[in-house]
A protein has these predicted regions:
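Amphipathic, hydrophobic secondary-structure cores in small proteins
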Residues: 13-66
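Intrinsic-disorder/low-complexity, polar/charged segments enriched in Ser/Thr/Lys/Arg/Asp/Glu/Gln
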Residues: 8-10, 35-39, 71-73
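Iron-sulfur (Fe-S) cluster-binding modules
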Residues: 1-2, 79
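Core SAM-dependent methyltransferase catalytic element
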Residues: 73-79
Length: 79
């Protein structure tokens, strides 16, 4: 993947368990304009497959992702 883009919004989902990171992500993306990017940070290991499935189902692509000190970081662009 390319370098991480500068996010338009940052969503802190650290400490939250499924399904809350996806619930908060869905709400955040609905409030954004097309092509804007949200950076979501989560600590629930289930976030990796959950965000991938959510991205595929909603057509909002993950443009970058990484793990830093057990924090999963996802940059998602609103379609």
């Amino acid at each position: 993947m390319a370098d991480a883009p500068t996010p338009d919004r940052i969503l802190d989902a650290k400490g939250l368990l499924c399904p809350m990171p996806i619930v908060k992500l869905s709400k955040a993306v609905k409030e954004m304009e097309s092509q804007q990017v949200v950076l979501m940070e989560a600590t629930d290991p289930g976030s990796v497959p959950d965000v991938a499935a959510w991205s595929k189902n909603t057509h909002n692509p993950i443009v970058h992702q990484e793990v830093v000190d057990k924090v999963m970081r996802f940059w998602i662009q609103k379609a």
